[in-house]
Amino acid sequence: MVYRPTFRKQGDGSRCAWQNCGPASQAMASQRFREGKDPLNHHGWPPMPSEIRNAISPNSCGGTTLQELDAGALLLYNTNMWVRYGVPWATFQSLIISGRGAVVQILYSVVHGTKFDGSPGFYGNHGIYVNERRVSDGAYLVYDPLCDHRRSYIPQGPQWWPAALLRRAAEAMPGTAPGCVNASFTVDTE
């Protein structure tokens, strides 16, 4: 069975909360990377978005890159992610099937209006965590840090997203090569 990390929302009341989709996704990826085992260092456990944010940018807010997230998580939790840009969809799919999780960059306008929409009215760049792929229908278990059920019409993550939706959202991310995904992968934990 694939290890499933604790869901982390980005709107947690901490500094930069509503800009912490990347740190929240990385927190979940770091917990998966270590399969829930505390590295027994002087940093908190389990991983939290605010701690990753403070390691990356202690005095400012804003978007984060996959490299920044990796550097913060490596410092805090000794989780060295495999950061890749322009990963062909078939390669992404095979890496998830093989037992890796991934922080994935998406364009949220693709998700808008679906039952997976965690922030109606938000259309920008976003970070999510993908934990696994279901064999029966090819859906992906997505931990969207916006899906925290803060209102009755906001879903609670994680959710099983259809592969077509995940692919469209990832391929629509500005700067992504056609047919490709920008992602940061955990080690194979299976």
Language-model features: locations:
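Noncatalytic regulatory segments and standalone regulatory/sensor domains
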Residues: 121-122, 133-190
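Active-site-adjacent substructure of cysteine-protease-like catalytic cores
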Residues: 87-143, 151
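Structured segments of extracytoplasmic/periplasmic soluble domains
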Residues: 24-36, 72-79, 95-98
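Active-site-adjacent structural segments surrounding the nucleophilic cysteine of cysteine proteases
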Residues: 1-63, 118, 135-137, 189
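Extracytoplasmic/secreted proteins, especially bacterial periplasmic and envelope-associated proteins
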Residues: 20, 24-28, 64, 68-72, ...
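Mid-length scaffold segments of soluble, non-membrane domains
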Residues: 62-86
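Short regulatory "switch" loops immediately downstream of catalytic or recognition motifs
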Residues: 31-38, 107-114, 147-148, 169-170
